[in-house]
C-alpha cells in the first residue's frame, strides 16, 4: 500500500511517469510462469502452436501488468549487440521484412499502450528500428555511458532515419560508478567552460545542441537513486536541469 501511495504521489503531484522495464531477449522474459517452458507456454498454449501469436500474447500480458499496477508504459531494453540476443532479439532491422517477431511485439504494445495515453520507449539499440516502426515508439534512449566527447555522443545518436529523432532522443549517464562525479571524469565538452567543472559529462548532455541547432530530446541517469546520497540530494540531476533550462536554454522547435 505504501508503494501504491508513493506511485500515486509521484504521478499526480510530481507529474512523473513510471514505466515498466526489462531486457527483451527471449519470448516470455520475466513473465513465463515458474516451472514452465517458455515455448510450451507462450507458443503451444497461448499461441496455439503459432510463434507470432505467442509474441502477441506476451506483449498483451505486459500491457495487462502495466494496467494492473497503474504504470505509465513500457521501456523495451533492447541490447542484442551487448550479449542479449535470443528468440526475439537479433541484429536484423526491426521491420515486417526484417525481424518480424520484434515488429509484431512493438505493434502489439503500441496499439494497447499509446491510445490509452501510455508510453512505449526503447533503450539500448533503438537504431535497429526501421523508419516506419520507429513511428510506433515515443522515445529512443541511448546508453551513452562511456562516450568521451560531445562529438562522439552526436555520432552515436545521429540517426535521421528514425522518426523525429532529434526530439525523441534521450541520452543517459552511468551512475553506478559515476554518481559522485556526474559521470565519467575524462569527458570533453564542446562548451570549453564546462570542461573546468566537475560533472561536465551530465552538464554537457543537459545542454547538448544537435547539428540542426535543436536541443536534445532529454537526458537521464542509469540508477538515478545513486544520486540521492549526494549533497544536496540528487545534486547532479538538479544541476543538469538548471543548466539545461536556465544557464543554456535550448531551441526545441
Show the residue positions of the predicted features:
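Chitinase-like catalytic core of GlcNAc-active glycosidases
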Residues: 1-200, 214-216, 225, 229-232, ...
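Cysteine-clustered segments with highest specificity for TGF-beta superfamily mature ligands
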Residues: 206, 212-220
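Extracellular low-complexity, O-glycosylation-prone Ser/Thr/Pro/Gly-rich "stalks"
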Residues: 221-253
Amino acid at each position: 500500500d505504501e508503494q501504491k501511495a508513493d506511485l500515486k504521489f509521484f504521478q499526480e503531484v510530481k507529474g512523473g511517469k513510471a514505466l515498466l522495464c526489462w531486457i527483451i531477449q527471449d519470448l516470455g522474459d520475466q513473465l513465463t510462469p515458474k516451472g514452465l517452458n517458455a515455448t510450451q507456454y507462450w507458443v503451444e498454449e497461448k499461441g496455439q502452436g503459432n510463434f507470432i501469436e505467442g509474441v502477441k500474447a506476451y506483449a498483451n500480458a505486459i500491457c495487462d501488468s502495466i494496467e494492473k499496477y497503474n504504470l505509465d508504459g513500457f521501456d523495451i531494453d533492447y541490447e542484442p549487440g551487448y550479449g542479449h540476443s535470443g528468440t526475439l532479439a537479433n541484429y536484423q532491422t526491426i521491420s515486417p521484412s526484417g525481424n518480424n517477431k520484434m515488429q509484431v511485439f512493438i505493434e502489439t504494445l503500441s496499439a494497447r499502450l499509446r491510445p490509452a495515453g501510455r508510453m512505449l520507449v526503447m533503450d539500448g539499440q533503438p537504431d535497429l528500428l526501421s523508419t516506419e516502426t520507429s513511428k510506433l515508439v515515443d522515445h529512443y534512449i541511448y546508453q551513452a555511458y562511456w562516450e568521451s566527447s560531445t562529438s562522439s555522443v552526436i555520432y552515436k545518436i545521429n540517426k535521421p532515419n528514425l522518426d523525429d529523432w532529434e526530439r525523441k532522443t534521450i541520452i543517459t549517464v552511468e551512475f553506478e560508478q559515476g554518481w559522485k562525479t556526474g559521470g565519467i571524469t575524462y569527458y570533453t565538452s564542446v562548451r570549453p567552460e564546462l570542461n573546468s567543472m566537475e560533472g561536465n559529462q551530465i552538464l554537457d548532455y543537459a545542454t547538448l545542441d544537435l547539428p540542426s541547432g535543436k536541443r536534445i530530446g532529454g537526458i537521464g541517469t542509469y540508477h538515478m537513486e545513486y544520486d540521492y546520497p549526494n549533497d544536496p540530494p540528487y545534486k547532479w540531476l538538479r544541476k543538469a536541469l538548471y543548466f539545461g533550462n536556465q544557464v543554456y536554454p535550448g531551441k526545441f522547435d
